[in-house]
Protein backbone atom coordinates (compact mmCIF):
# COMPACT_ATOMS: atom_id res chain seq x y z
CA UNK A 1 0.00 0.00 0.00
CA UNK A 2 1.48 3.33 -1.06
CA UNK A 3 1.29 6.50 1.02
CA UNK A 4 -1.09 8.06 -1.54
CA UNK A 5 -3.44 5.08 -1.37
CA UNK A 6 -3.35 5.18 2.42
CA UNK A 7 -4.16 8.91 2.36
CA UNK A 8 -7.25 8.26 0.24
CA UNK A 9 -8.41 5.49 2.58
CA UNK A 10 -7.76 7.75 5.57
CA UNK A 11 -10.00 10.49 4.14
CA UNK A 12 -12.84 8.01 3.54
CA UNK A 13 -12.36 6.55 7.02
CA UNK A 14 -12.40 9.98 8.66
CA UNK A 15 -15.53 11.11 6.80
CA UNK A 16 -17.36 7.83 7.50
CA UNK A 17 -16.39 7.83 11.17
CA UNK A 18 -17.38 11.49 11.54
CA UNK A 19 -20.73 10.80 9.84
CA UNK A 20 -21.66 7.91 12.16
CA UNK A 21 -20.16 9.48 15.30
CA UNK A 22 -22.05 12.76 14.74
CA UNK A 23 -25.42 11.03 14.37
CA UNK A 24 -24.67 8.90 17.42
CA UNK A 25 -23.68 11.95 19.47
CA UNK A 26 -26.91 13.79 18.63
CA UNK A 27 -28.92 10.71 19.59
CA UNK A 28 -26.96 10.38 22.83
CA UNK A 29 -27.62 14.04 23.68
CA UNK A 30 -31.33 13.49 23.01
CA UNK A 31 -31.97 10.29 24.98
CA UNK A 32 -28.66 9.47 26.72
CA UNK A 33 -29.21 5.78 25.98
CA UNK A 34 -31.23 3.61 23.67
CA UNK A 35 -30.37 0.60 21.55
CA UNK A 36 -29.77 2.77 18.51
CA UNK A 37 -26.94 4.46 20.43
CA UNK A 38 -25.58 1.08 21.50
CA UNK A 39 -25.75 -0.44 18.02
CA UNK A 40 -24.17 2.67 16.48
CA UNK A 41 -21.20 2.48 18.87
CA UNK A 42 -20.95 -1.25 18.25
CA UNK A 43 -21.02 -0.67 14.49
CA UNK A 44 -18.27 1.96 14.76
CA UNK A 45 -16.19 -0.42 16.84
CA UNK A 46 -16.66 -3.37 14.48
CA UNK A 47 -16.10 -1.68 11.12
CA UNK A 48 -13.97 1.42 11.82
CA UNK A 49 -11.96 0.98 15.03
CA UNK A 50 -9.66 -1.52 13.32
CA UNK A 51 -8.50 0.77 10.51
CA UNK A 52 -5.82 2.59 12.59
CA UNK A 53 -4.62 -0.76 13.95
CA UNK A 54 -4.38 -2.18 10.43
CA UNK A 55 -2.48 0.91 9.29
CA UNK A 56 0.14 0.51 12.02
CA UNK A 57 0.48 -3.20 11.21
CA UNK A 58 1.03 -2.38 7.53
CA UNK A 59 3.54 0.47 7.89
CA UNK A 60 5.28 -0.61 11.11
CA UNK A 61 5.40 -4.39 10.65
CA UNK A 62 4.87 -4.73 6.87
CA UNK A 63 1.83 -6.99 7.31
CA UNK A 64 0.03 -7.96 4.11
CA UNK A 65 -3.59 -6.85 3.71
CA UNK A 66 -6.22 -6.82 0.99
CA UNK A 67 -5.63 -4.43 -1.95
CA UNK A 68 -6.47 -0.76 -1.22
CA UNK A 69 -9.45 -0.77 -3.61
CA UNK A 70 -10.94 -3.70 -1.65
CA UNK A 71 -10.37 -1.93 1.66
CA UNK A 72 -12.09 1.11 0.16
CA UNK A 73 -15.08 -1.04 -0.79
CA UNK A 74 -15.24 -2.37 2.78
CA UNK A 75 -15.26 1.14 4.27
CA UNK A 76 -17.82 2.47 1.79
CA UNK A 77 -20.12 -0.54 2.17
CA UNK A 78 -20.08 -0.05 5.96
CA UNK A 79 -20.87 3.68 5.64
CA UNK A 80 -23.68 3.05 3.14
CA UNK A 81 -25.10 0.26 5.32
CA UNK A 82 -25.27 2.59 8.30
CA UNK A 83 -26.93 5.31 6.21
CA UNK A 84 -29.72 2.96 5.11
CA UNK A 85 -30.01 1.57 8.64
CA UNK A 86 -30.34 5.04 10.17
CA UNK A 87 -33.00 6.18 7.70
CA UNK A 88 -34.97 2.98 8.38
CA UNK A 89 -34.66 3.41 12.13
CA UNK A 90 -35.85 7.03 12.02
CA UNK A 91 -38.69 6.50 9.53
CA UNK A 92 -42.23 6.28 10.89
CA UNK A 93 -44.82 4.61 8.69
CA UNK A 94 -47.68 5.94 10.79
CA UNK A 95 -48.28 8.90 13.05
CA UNK A 96 -47.39 8.57 16.68
CA UNK A 97 -50.59 8.54 18.71
CA UNK A 98 -51.06 9.22 22.38
CA UNK A 99 -50.92 5.97 24.30
CA UNK A 100 -54.38 4.73 25.18
CA UNK A 101 -54.99 2.26 28.02
CA UNK A 102 -54.99 -1.29 26.74
CA UNK A 103 -55.03 -4.69 28.35
CA UNK A 104 -51.42 -5.72 29.07
CA UNK A 105 -50.07 -8.89 27.48
CA UNK A 106 -48.81 -10.09 30.86
CA UNK A 107 -48.33 -8.84 34.41
CA UNK A 108 -45.77 -9.63 37.09
CA UNK A 109 -45.85 -9.60 40.87
CA UNK A 110 -43.06 -9.70 43.43
CA UNK A 111 -42.95 -13.48 43.89
CA UNK A 112 -43.12 -14.24 40.16
CA UNK A 113 -40.29 -11.81 39.46
CA UNK A 114 -38.01 -13.28 42.12
CA UNK A 115 -38.82 -16.79 40.92
CA UNK A 116 -37.90 -15.75 37.37
CA UNK A 117 -34.39 -14.56 38.22
CA UNK A 118 -33.80 -17.57 40.46
CA UNK A 119 -34.79 -19.90 37.59
CA UNK A 120 -32.54 -18.05 35.12
CA UNK A 121 -29.64 -18.20 37.57
CA UNK A 122 -30.34 -21.87 38.23
CA UNK A 123 -30.22 -22.65 34.51
CA UNK A 124 -26.79 -21.02 34.26
CA UNK A 125 -25.30 -22.53 37.43
CA UNK A 126 -26.57 -26.06 36.77
CA UNK A 127 -25.24 -25.92 33.20
CA UNK A 128 -21.83 -24.74 34.43
CA UNK A 129 -21.74 -27.46 37.10
CA UNK A 130 -22.57 -30.24 34.63
CA UNK A 131 -20.04 -28.94 32.10
CA UNK A 132 -17.38 -28.76 34.83
CA UNK A 133 -18.08 -32.31 35.99
CA UNK A 134 -17.56 -33.53 32.42
CA UNK A 135 -14.49 -31.47 31.53
CA UNK A 136 -12.92 -29.77 34.57
CA UNK A 137 -10.98 -26.54 34.03
CA UNK A 138 -10.27 -26.64 30.29
CA UNK A 139 -8.05 -23.55 30.47
CA UNK A 140 -5.41 -25.63 32.27
CA UNK A 141 -6.02 -28.88 30.35
CA UNK A 142 -6.04 -27.93 26.68
CA UNK A 143 -2.96 -26.96 24.70
CA UNK A 144 -4.72 -24.77 22.10
CA UNK A 145 -7.95 -22.77 22.03
CA UNK A 146 -9.27 -24.66 18.99
CA UNK A 147 -9.42 -27.83 21.09
CA UNK A 148 -12.56 -26.59 22.88
CA UNK A 149 -14.44 -27.33 19.64
CA UNK A 150 -13.01 -30.85 19.33
CA UNK A 151 -14.43 -34.21 20.40
CA UNK A 152 -12.24 -34.07 23.53
CA UNK A 153 -14.77 -31.69 25.06
CA UNK A 154 -18.23 -33.00 25.94
CA UNK A 155 -21.42 -31.13 26.68
CA UNK A 156 -20.56 -28.22 24.39
CA UNK A 157 -24.27 -27.40 23.98
CA UNK A 158 -24.43 -26.47 27.68
CA UNK A 159 -22.33 -23.36 27.01
CA UNK A 160 -25.36 -21.72 25.42
CA UNK A 161 -27.07 -21.64 28.82
CA UNK A 162 -24.20 -20.02 30.74
CA UNK A 163 -25.19 -16.56 29.56
CA UNK A 164 -28.54 -16.58 31.40
CA UNK A 165 -26.72 -15.67 34.61
CA UNK A 166 -26.48 -12.09 33.32
CA UNK A 167 -30.25 -11.57 32.74
CA UNK A 168 -30.85 -13.04 36.20
CA UNK A 169 -28.55 -10.46 37.80
CA UNK A 170 -30.12 -7.74 35.65
CA UNK A 171 -33.51 -8.49 37.22
CA UNK A 172 -31.91 -8.17 40.67
CA UNK A 173 -30.42 -4.80 39.70
CA UNK A 174 -33.56 -3.36 38.10
CA UNK A 175 -35.62 -4.22 41.19
CA UNK A 176 -33.46 -1.84 43.25
CA UNK A 177 -31.57 0.40 40.80
CA UNK A 178 -29.16 1.92 43.31
CA UNK A 179 -25.37 2.11 43.29
CA UNK A 180 -24.97 -0.92 45.57
CA UNK A 181 -27.06 -3.08 43.24
CA UNK A 182 -25.06 -1.71 40.30
CA UNK A 183 -21.73 -2.68 41.88
CA UNK A 184 -23.15 -6.06 42.92
CA UNK A 185 -24.10 -6.68 39.30
CA UNK A 186 -20.52 -5.98 38.19
CA UNK A 187 -18.86 -8.13 40.85
CA UNK A 188 -21.22 -11.10 40.47
CA UNK A 189 -21.28 -11.20 36.67
CA UNK A 190 -17.54 -10.61 36.17
CA UNK A 191 -16.76 -13.28 38.80
CA UNK A 192 -19.07 -15.67 36.96
CA UNK A 193 -17.44 -14.69 33.66
CA UNK A 194 -13.96 -15.44 35.02
CA UNK A 195 -15.20 -18.80 36.28
CA UNK A 196 -16.60 -19.73 32.86
CA UNK A 197 -13.40 -18.41 31.25
CA UNK A 198 -11.39 -21.00 33.19
CA UNK A 199 -13.92 -23.80 32.79
CA UNK A 200 -14.58 -23.36 29.06
CA UNK A 201 -10.96 -22.69 28.21
CA UNK A 202 -10.76 -19.05 27.18
CA UNK A 203 -14.23 -17.78 26.25
CA UNK A 204 -14.32 -14.09 27.16
CA UNK A 205 -17.87 -13.24 26.03
CA UNK A 206 -19.50 -13.26 29.48
CA UNK A 207 -16.84 -10.91 30.86
CA UNK A 208 -17.10 -8.47 27.95
CA UNK A 209 -20.90 -8.37 28.05
CA UNK A 210 -21.09 -7.94 31.83
CA UNK A 211 -18.60 -5.06 31.76
CA UNK A 212 -20.36 -3.37 28.81
CA UNK A 213 -23.80 -3.57 30.46
CA UNK A 214 -22.32 -2.23 33.72
CA UNK A 215 -20.91 0.79 31.88
CA UNK A 216 -24.11 1.55 29.98
CA UNK A 217 -26.19 1.37 33.15
CA UNK A 218 -23.72 3.79 34.72
CA UNK A 219 -24.12 6.17 31.77
CA UNK A 220 -27.93 6.00 31.98
CA UNK A 221 -27.98 6.75 35.72
CA UNK A 222 -25.27 9.42 35.52
CA UNK A 223 -22.83 7.46 37.69
CA UNK A 224 -20.24 7.42 34.88
CA UNK A 225 -19.08 10.38 32.81
CA UNK A 226 -17.85 10.16 29.23
CA UNK A 227 -14.18 10.43 30.21
CA UNK A 228 -14.67 7.62 32.73
CA UNK A 229 -16.30 5.57 29.97
CA UNK A 230 -13.29 6.19 27.72
CA UNK A 231 -10.89 5.20 30.51
CA UNK A 232 -12.91 2.06 31.20
CA UNK A 233 -12.81 1.25 27.47
CA UNK A 234 -9.01 1.44 27.46
CA UNK A 235 -8.90 -0.73 30.59
CA UNK A 236 -11.25 -3.21 28.92
CA UNK A 237 -9.05 -3.42 25.81
CA UNK A 238 -5.95 -4.11 27.92
CA UNK A 239 -7.85 -6.67 29.99
CA UNK A 240 -9.13 -8.52 26.94
CA UNK A 241 -5.60 -8.55 25.49
CA UNK A 242 -4.24 -10.12 28.68
CA UNK A 243 -6.98 -12.76 28.68
CA UNK A 244 -6.26 -13.48 25.01
CA UNK A 245 -2.57 -14.04 25.82
CA UNK A 246 -3.55 -16.54 28.49
CA UNK A 247 -6.06 -18.20 26.18
CA UNK A 248 -3.52 -18.77 23.41
CA UNK A 249 -0.61 -19.44 25.78
CA UNK A 250 1.51 -16.58 24.37
CA UNK A 251 4.59 -15.16 26.08
CA UNK A 252 5.72 -12.07 24.18
CA UNK A 253 7.76 -8.93 24.83
CA UNK A 254 9.14 -5.89 23.01
CA UNK A 255 8.12 -5.37 19.38
CA UNK A 256 6.52 -8.80 19.31
CA UNK A 257 4.25 -7.81 22.20
CA UNK A 258 3.20 -4.61 20.40
CA UNK A 259 2.54 -6.53 17.19
CA UNK A 260 0.53 -9.16 19.08
CA UNK A 261 -1.46 -6.45 20.86
CA UNK A 262 -2.37 -4.80 17.55
CA UNK A 263 -3.60 -7.87 15.74
CA UNK A 264 -5.35 -9.46 18.73
CA UNK A 265 -7.13 -6.19 19.57
CA UNK A 266 -8.16 -5.76 15.92
CA UNK A 267 -9.46 -9.33 15.67
CA UNK A 268 -11.25 -9.13 19.04
CA UNK A 269 -13.01 -5.79 18.64
CA UNK A 270 -12.91 -4.87 14.95
CA UNK A 271 -12.71 -7.75 12.45
CA UNK A 272 -13.33 -5.36 9.54
CA UNK A 273 -10.59 -6.94 7.42
CA UNK A 274 -12.69 -10.12 7.27
CA UNK A 275 -15.25 -8.14 5.27
CA UNK A 276 -12.44 -7.03 2.95
CA UNK A 277 -11.36 -10.67 2.50
CA UNK A 278 -14.93 -11.60 1.56
CA UNK A 279 -15.14 -8.79 -0.98
CA UNK A 280 -11.74 -9.79 -2.37
CA UNK A 281 -13.11 -13.30 -2.99
CA UNK A 282 -16.52 -12.07 -4.13
CA UNK A 283 -16.29 -13.94 -7.46
CA UNK A 284 -15.76 -17.25 -5.59
CA UNK A 285 -18.88 -16.98 -3.43
CA UNK A 286 -21.82 -19.23 -4.19
CA UNK A 287 -24.60 -17.13 -2.66
CA UNK A 288 -26.45 -19.12 0.00
CA UNK A 289 -29.74 -17.22 0.18
CA UNK A 290 -31.53 -17.55 3.53
CA UNK A 291 -30.19 -21.08 4.08
CA UNK A 292 -27.53 -19.98 6.64
CA UNK A 293 -30.30 -18.66 8.92
CA UNK A 294 -32.09 -22.03 8.82
CA UNK A 295 -28.85 -24.01 9.21
CA UNK A 296 -27.79 -22.02 12.26
CA UNK A 297 -30.76 -23.46 14.16
CA UNK A 298 -29.30 -26.96 13.71
CA UNK A 299 -26.94 -26.49 16.66
CA UNK A 300 -29.92 -26.11 19.01
CA UNK A 301 -31.46 -29.44 18.00
CA UNK A 302 -30.05 -32.37 20.06
CA UNK A 303 -28.90 -35.46 18.16
CA UNK A 304 -31.27 -37.69 20.14
CA UNK A 305 -34.14 -35.67 18.68
CA UNK A 306 -32.65 -35.58 15.17
CA UNK A 307 -30.28 -38.55 14.73
CA UNK A 308 -29.45 -37.50 11.17
CA UNK A 309 -28.55 -33.93 12.09
CA UNK A 310 -25.57 -32.69 10.02
CA UNK A 311 -22.42 -32.63 12.13
CA UNK A 312 -21.15 -29.62 10.15
CA UNK A 313 -23.37 -26.52 10.16
CA UNK A 314 -22.74 -24.40 7.08
CA UNK A 315 -23.78 -20.99 8.38
CA UNK A 316 -22.22 -17.82 6.98
CA UNK A 317 -19.21 -17.95 9.36
CA UNK A 318 -18.36 -21.55 8.49
CA UNK A 319 -18.96 -20.95 4.79
CA UNK A 320 -16.58 -17.98 4.91
CA UNK A 321 -13.98 -19.98 6.85
CA UNK A 322 -14.12 -23.25 4.94
CA UNK A 323 -15.30 -22.42 1.44
CA UNK A 324 -13.92 -18.90 0.91
CA UNK A 325 -10.70 -18.95 2.95
CA UNK A 326 -10.16 -22.73 2.79
CA UNK A 327 -9.28 -22.61 6.49
CA UNK A 328 -9.90 -25.86 8.37
CA UNK A 329 -8.10 -25.06 11.62
CA UNK A 330 -11.22 -25.73 13.69
CA UNK A 331 -12.02 -22.07 14.45
CA UNK A 332 -14.79 -20.21 12.63
CA UNK A 333 -13.72 -16.75 11.44
CA UNK A 334 -16.28 -13.98 11.95
CA UNK A 335 -17.61 -12.64 8.62
CA UNK A 336 -19.20 -9.56 10.30
CA UNK A 337 -22.80 -8.46 9.77
CA UNK A 338 -22.19 -7.08 6.28
CA UNK A 339 -20.08 -10.11 5.36
CA UNK A 340 -22.90 -12.49 6.28
CA UNK A 341 -25.24 -10.52 4.03
CA UNK A 342 -22.71 -10.79 1.18
CA UNK A 343 -22.53 -14.57 1.69
CA UNK A 344 -26.32 -14.82 1.60
CA UNK A 345 -27.07 -12.62 -1.39
CA UNK A 346 -24.15 -10.48 -2.50
CA UNK A 347 -24.14 -6.69 -2.66
CA UNK A 348 -27.94 -6.57 -3.16
CA UNK A 349 -28.48 -7.97 0.33
CA UNK A 350 -26.51 -5.16 2.01
CA UNK A 351 -29.24 -2.45 1.80
CA UNK A 352 -31.96 -5.06 2.42
CA UNK A 353 -30.10 -6.25 5.52
CA UNK A 354 -29.71 -2.65 6.70
CA UNK A 355 -33.48 -2.22 6.54
CA UNK A 356 -34.04 -5.43 8.52
CA UNK A 357 -31.50 -4.42 11.17
CA UNK A 358 -33.09 -0.96 11.45
CA UNK A 359 -36.45 -2.58 12.19
CA UNK A 360 -34.87 -4.98 14.72
CA UNK A 361 -33.23 -2.16 16.69
CA UNK A 362 -36.45 -0.12 16.48
CA UNK A 363 -38.32 -3.05 18.06
CA UNK A 364 -35.84 -3.34 20.93
CA UNK A 365 -36.13 0.40 21.58
CA UNK A 366 -39.92 0.13 21.59
CA UNK A 367 -39.67 -2.63 24.19
CA UNK A 368 -37.17 -0.60 26.22
CA UNK A 369 -39.48 2.45 26.22
CA UNK A 370 -42.35 0.18 27.21
CA UNK A 371 -40.34 -0.80 30.28
CA UNK A 372 -39.55 2.85 31.06
CA UNK A 373 -43.26 3.74 31.03
CA UNK A 374 -44.39 0.65 32.94
CA UNK A 375 -45.83 1.58 36.38
CA UNK A 376 -45.46 -2.00 37.66
CA UNK A 377 -41.82 -2.11 38.77
CA UNK A 378 -41.70 -5.92 38.65
CA UNK A 379 -42.84 -6.05 35.04
CA UNK A 380 -40.49 -3.17 34.21
CA UNK A 381 -37.57 -5.13 35.70
CA UNK A 382 -38.42 -8.13 33.50
CA UNK A 383 -38.71 -6.00 30.34
CA UNK A 384 -35.44 -4.19 31.02
CA UNK A 385 -33.67 -7.44 31.85
CA UNK A 386 -34.80 -8.92 28.55
CA UNK A 387 -33.66 -5.88 26.58
CA UNK A 388 -30.26 -5.53 28.23
CA UNK A 389 -29.82 -9.29 28.23
CA UNK A 390 -30.17 -9.20 24.45
CA UNK A 391 -27.06 -7.00 24.17
CA UNK A 392 -25.03 -10.17 23.70
CA UNK A 393 -27.18 -11.04 20.70
CA UNK A 394 -26.58 -7.57 19.22
CA UNK A 395 -22.83 -8.10 19.52
CA UNK A 396 -23.31 -11.42 17.72
CA UNK A 397 -25.28 -9.52 15.06
CA UNK A 398 -22.43 -7.08 14.38
CA UNK A 399 -19.58 -9.60 14.55
CA UNK A 400 -21.00 -12.94 13.39
CA UNK A 401 -23.86 -11.90 11.14
CA UNK A 402 -27.61 -11.93 10.73
CA UNK A 403 -27.95 -15.73 10.63
CA UNK A 404 -26.21 -16.23 13.99
CA UNK A 405 -28.23 -13.39 15.51
CA UNK A 406 -31.61 -14.80 14.46
CA UNK A 407 -30.97 -18.26 15.91
CA UNK A 408 -29.56 -16.91 19.16
CA UNK A 409 -32.24 -14.31 19.76
CA UNK A 410 -34.94 -16.93 19.17
CA UNK A 411 -33.16 -19.27 21.61
CA UNK A 412 -32.86 -16.44 24.15
CA UNK A 413 -36.54 -15.58 23.73
CA UNK A 414 -37.63 -19.21 24.19
CA UNK A 415 -35.56 -19.82 27.34
CA UNK A 416 -36.44 -16.43 28.86
CA UNK A 417 -40.13 -16.91 28.05
CA UNK A 418 -40.12 -20.47 29.41
CA UNK A 419 -38.57 -19.20 32.66
CA UNK A 420 -41.39 -16.65 32.96
CA UNK A 421 -44.03 -19.31 32.40
CA UNK A 422 -42.45 -21.68 34.93
CA UNK A 423 -42.27 -18.84 37.47
CA UNK A 424 -45.97 -18.09 36.97
CA UNK A 425 -46.83 -21.79 37.25
CA UNK A 426 -44.85 -22.12 40.49
CA UNK A 427 -46.54 -19.02 41.89
CA UNK A 428 -49.96 -20.50 41.06
CA UNK A 429 -49.02 -23.78 42.76
CA UNK A 430 -47.65 -22.03 45.86
CA UNK A 431 -50.67 -19.73 46.02
CA UNK A 432 -53.07 -22.67 45.66
CA UNK A 433 -51.26 -24.42 48.51
CA UNK A 434 -51.64 -21.33 50.71
CA UNK A 435 -47.91 -20.64 50.84
CA UNK A 436 -48.17 -17.10 49.45
CA UNK A 437 -49.06 -14.36 51.93
CA UNK A 438 -49.61 -10.74 51.06
CA UNK A 439 -47.32 -8.24 52.72
CA UNK A 440 -49.13 -6.07 55.26
CA UNK A 441 -47.92 -2.78 56.69
CA UNK A 442 -47.92 -2.47 60.45
CA UNK A 443 -50.11 0.25 61.99
CA UNK A 444 -47.29 2.40 63.37
CA UNK A 445 -45.54 2.34 60.03
CA UNK A 446 -48.79 3.21 58.24
CA UNK A 447 -49.31 6.13 60.59
CA UNK A 448 -45.75 7.28 60.03
CA UNK A 449 -46.28 7.05 56.25
CA UNK A 450 -49.38 9.17 56.62
CA UNK A 451 -47.48 11.81 58.54
CA UNK A 452 -44.77 11.84 55.90
Swiss-Prot record:
GO biological process: enterobacterial common antigen biosynthetic process
Annotated metabolic or biological route of this protein: Bacterial outer membrane biogenesis; enterobacterial common antigen biosynthesis
Alphabetically ordered keywords of this record: Cell inner membrane, Cell membrane, Membrane, Transmembrane, Transmembrane helix
Statement: the UniProt record of this protein carries the keyword Isomerase: no
Location(s), subcellular: Cell inner membrane
Major localization class: membrane
GO CC, any one term: plasma membrane
Family: Belongs to the WzyE family.
Protein name: Probable ECA polymerase
Gene: wzyE
